[in-house]
Amino acid sequence: MAKTAYEPRLKKEYVERIRKAMQEKFSYANEMQIPRLDKIVINMGVGEATGDSKKPSVAAADLAAIAGQKPVITRARNSIAGFKLREGMPIGAKVTLRGVRMYEFLDRLVNIALPRVRDFRGLNPKSFDGRGNFAMGIKEHIVFPEINYDKVDQMWGMDIIVCTTATNDDEARALLAEFNFPFRQ
């Protein structure tokens, strides 16, 4: 007897609807050429870490709540005297999401977090890197429902990079538009 494994809503939508739409739009010769999501990288830089060594761990705890996965503390690669930064000091946190957690995070990002951003007018459609990856920044991490606004002592910004298997920006833009990314017109 086979177990029915949990499948995220967006993954199901990708398999049933988005793959067909991408095939019709770009008419790929092979089914494996259809672009798909590869990974999502969330990076949180903590500029105040030089003054207080506890800040990166607090930011990492918030990032763990948002991503549902334990982040890696990033450390300074070299010393910069002007910033009072020493090599090896913790300066942020990052997490790489793949599979089920990636689709769940994407669902929360597009449907819950982005509409809660103050003065949000859409994502910049030029934020692609030329190889099918999309990068965006969020100024306040409290837009995510996992973060309790009353218990937050400081706002953190974060970078979110959505990596796809698309070979160019047009294919990646079409793929993310099918996932309901709110691109600016």
UniProtKB/Swiss-Prot annotation:
It comes from the Bacteria. InterPro entries: Ribosomal_uL5, Ribosomal_uL5_bac-type, Ribosomal_uL5_C, Ribosomal_uL5_CS, Ribosomal_uL5_dom_sf, Ribosomal_uL5_N. The keyword Signal does not apply. Keywords: Ribonucleoprotein, Ribosomal protein, RNA-binding, rRNA-binding, tRNA-binding. GO terms for biological process: translation. GO terms for molecular function: rRNA binding; structural constituent of ribosome; tRNA binding. The keyword Ribonucleoprotein applies. GO terms for cellular component: ribonucleoprotein complex; ribosome. HAMAP family: Ribosomal_uL5_B (MF_01333_B). Belongs to the universal ribosomal protein uL5 family. Part of the 50S ribosomal subunit; part of the 5S rRNA/L5/L18/L25 subcomplex. Contacts the 5S rRNA and the P site tRNA. Forms a bridge to the 30S subunit in the 70S ribosome. PANTHER family: 60S RIBOSOMAL PROTEIN L11-RELATED (PTHR11994). This is one of the proteins that bind and probably mediate the attachment of the 5S RNA into the large ribosomal subunit, where it forms part of the central protuberance. In the 70S ribosome it contacts protein S13 of the 30S subunit (bridge B1b), connecting the 2 subunits; this bridge is implicated in subunit movement. Contacts the P site tRNA; the 5S rRNA and some of its associated proteins might help stabilize positioning of ribosome-bound tRNAs. This is Large ribosomal subunit protein uL5. It comes from Sinorhizobium fredii (strain NBRC 101917 / NGR234).
